[in-house]
Each structure stands twice: as structure tokens, then as C-alpha cells.
Swiss-Prot record:
This is Protein GrpE 1. Its main location: cytoplasm. Coiled coil: none annotated. It is found in: Cytoplasm. GO terms for biological process: protein folding. The gene is grpE1. Keywords: Chaperone, Cytoplasm, Stress response. Homodimer. Belongs to the GrpE family. PROSITE patterns: GRPE.
Length: 202
């Protein structure tokens, strides 16, 4: 009887031990599943964070590139403005000199045919001054507009009079009353005052 009782107790202990092992295994499995779930969640979070980081880095790189481009554009604009200022800084001074050159030209045209020694000396001195002024203008890239027999260009010519003539094409410069001037072949300092041809039969 005692043996049976012991056997029963032993069986109960075994069963309890088995149950405990099963519970422990179940708990371990649950822990393992929980850990796997946590690992999955962590991996997803890491993936999301990596994507966000990559996007942020791309955004920063794009902003840096944009800023670099803007700096380059600004630098180009500044250099361009400085170059323009340098090129055209003397514009007002040159414009002030033009009437002096005009007056010398007019004076020379009035006395050019005089043969007396007094006039010849004046003509020589005025020619010398005139050539010096032309050299200075040339050094500063000032070009004269005084060509005849070319098409009238309203950008550089100012029509002062019309010459009706069937032998010359319409809208051609017949004569230049006052020379015009350009700075760096880009900026008009003063238009040339010209006489323009027009056919009588038109």
C-alpha cells in the first residue's frame, strides 16, 4: 500500500515536473516570440530612421548645392557689376569732353584752308591737341560714329535733316553734322547727328 502511495506521489511529482517544464517551455517560447516581435519592431524603426536620415542628408546636400549655386550666381553678378562699373565709370567725364572735341573740329573746319603763317601755326597746334584727345578716347575704347553712305540706324544716328535725292538709296547717311560716340562698342555716349537720304519719287 505504501508503495502504491509513493508511486502515486512520484507520478504526481513527475507530472508536476513535466507541467512545469511545459510551462517553462511555453514561457520561453512566449519570450522568444516577444523578442522576435521586438526585434522586428526595432528593425522597422531602424529602417524608418535610416530612410529619414538618408532623406535629410539628401535635403542638406541639395540645400548646400543650391546655396553654392546661389553664391556662384551672386559672385558672377557682382563681378559683372564691377566690370561694368570699371568699363563705364568714365562715361560722364567723356561726355563732358565731347563738346570740346566738337569745338576743335569746328574751328579746324573754319580755318583749314587759310594759308597765312599765323593760321598755319594755330592749325598745327589744334591738330596736335585734337590728335591727343583722339588717342585718349581710343585708350578708353571710345569709338567715333561718323561714317557716310551707310544705312541709317536709329540706335546710333539721329536724323537732323532729309536730303531728297534719286541717286542715293533711301534711309542712307548722306552727311554727318556732328559725330557720335560709343563706349566699348556697347554703350552709346551720343548719337551721330546726320542727314538722311530719301528718294523724291517715293
Amino acid at each position: 500500500m505504501k508503495n502504491k502511495k509513493e508511486e502515486k506521489i512520484n507520478n504526481l511529482k513527475k507530472e508536476e515536473k513535466i507541467n512545469n517544464l511545459k510551462k517553462e517551455e511555453k514561457i520561453n517560447n512566449l519570450k522568444k516570440e516577444e523578442k522576435e516581435k521586438n526585434d522586428d519592431v526595432q528593425n522597422k524603426i531602424i529602417d524608418l530612421l535610416e530612410i529619414k536620415l538618408k532623406k535629410s542628408q539628401e535635403k542638406i546636400i541639395n540645400m548646400q548645392l543650391k546655396n553654392h549655386e546661389e553664391i556662384l550666381k551672386l559672385n558672377y553678378r557682382l563681378n559683372s557689376d564691377i566690370e561694368k562699373s570699371r568699363k563705364f565709370s568714365l562715361e560722364k567725364v567723356i561726355i563732358e569732353f565731347l563738346p570740346i572735341i566738337d569745338n576743335i573740329e569746328r574751328a579746324l573746319s573754319v580755318i583749314k584752308d587759310k594759308k597765312e603763317a599765323f593760321y598755319l601755326e594755330i592749325i598745327n597746334k589744334m591738330n596736335f591737341i585734337f590728335s591727343l584727345l583722339e588717342e585718349i578716347l581710343s585708350e578708353f575704347n571710345v569709338s567715333k560714329i561718323n561714317e557716310k553712305n551707310i544705312s541709317f540706324d536709329p540706335e546710333i544716328h539721329q536724323a537732323m535733316s532729309i536730303n531728297y535725292n534719286d541717286e542715293i538709296e533711301d534711309n542712307h547717311v548722306v552727311d554727318v553734322m556732328q559725330s557720335g560716340y560709343m563706349l566699348h562698342k556697347a554703350r552709346l555716349l551720343r548719337p551721330a547727328m546726320v542727314i538722311v537720304s530719301k528718294r523724291k519719287n517715293n
